[in-house]
A protein has these predicted regions:
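Short, Lys/Arg-enriched, disordered terminal segments
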Residues: 1-7, 203-208
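N-terminal interaction modules that seed assembly of large macromolecular complexes
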Residues: 2, 7-73
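Conserved aromatic-histidine-acidic binding/catalytic patches
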Residues: 4, 8-11, 67, 71, ...
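Intrinsically disordered or highly flexible coil/loop and linker segments, enriched in small
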Residues: 33, 55-62, 89-96, 129-136, ...
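Long amphipathic alpha-helical segments
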Residues: 58-127
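Acidic, proline/glycine-rich low-complexity IDRs
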Residues: 107, 122-208
Length: 208
């Protein structure tokens, strides 16, 4: 007699499946997206995905056979290349919180696109099996996805989130005019002449 899992009907599982499916769909359709939109959306989806994964009930494998895999090497590589194209020069980042740091005292260069493809692979394999609707394999795919979350893709998600945060907000800082430098120059120009006739404020273009 086959074992039946009740865990797969848990509310937290249903919510995780919903967010996970949206995450996969977003990455699959992101090829022509502008980088700003892509980064902004991921900064909202990834924390939610982590939260829903962390709230999953403990699940144990009940079947004898491993669930099918959906993501092939080709699928993975096509997605990674598409994401790298969106991020362009912002794809690389330095990471210090990975296992390889045990053997090195220098930060390791990572790629946001590769991290996202790694997360996608684990999530998509789970979603593919779960949507087939077979109780035992649904349960086992959930158990595997949960274990992979604990072992690697949860940490990968957090690392990627930090890198994406840097892309969004450091880029914003770089785009802002360096007012301090202008002010310093302005102050030096004022020295030695009548401030009543100084046009320094007029020279500083604040946009109004």
């Amino acid at each position: 007699m086959k074992k039946e899992s009740q865990v797969i009907f848990d509310r937290n599982v249903v919510e995780f499946v919903t967010v996970a499916a949206e995450f996969c769909k977003f990455l699959e359709q992101a090829e022509t997206m502008k980088r700003d939109t892509f980064v902004d959306t991921l900064l909202k989806i990834l924390p939610l995905l982590y939260l829903k994964a962390a709230m999953l009930p403990e699940t144990e494998i009940i079947g004898d056979d491993a669930p099918e895999s959906y993501v092939t090497e080709e699928t993975y590589e096509v997605l990674r290349i598409n994401l790298a194209g969106i991020l362009a020069e912002k794809d690389d980042y330095l990471d210090v919180f990975i296992q390889d740091m045990v053997y090195s005292d220098q930060p390791i260069k990572k790629n946001i696109s590769e991290d996202l493809a790694d997360i996608y692979q684990a999530i998509k394999d789970f979603i593919f099996v779960f949507q087939l609707g077979l109780n035992e394999t649904m349960n086992d795919s959930l158990a595997i996805c949960q274990e992979q979350f604990k072992e690697y893709w949860g940490q990968t998600l957090v690392n990627t989130l930090r890198a994406l945060h840097d892309v969004k907000y450091r880029q914003s800082e770089e785009d802002e005019p360096e007012d301090d430098d202008f002010e310093d120059e302005g102050e030096s120009d004022c020295h030695g002449h009548d401030h009543g006739h100084c046009d320094c404020e007029k020279d500083l273009n604040y946009g109004y």
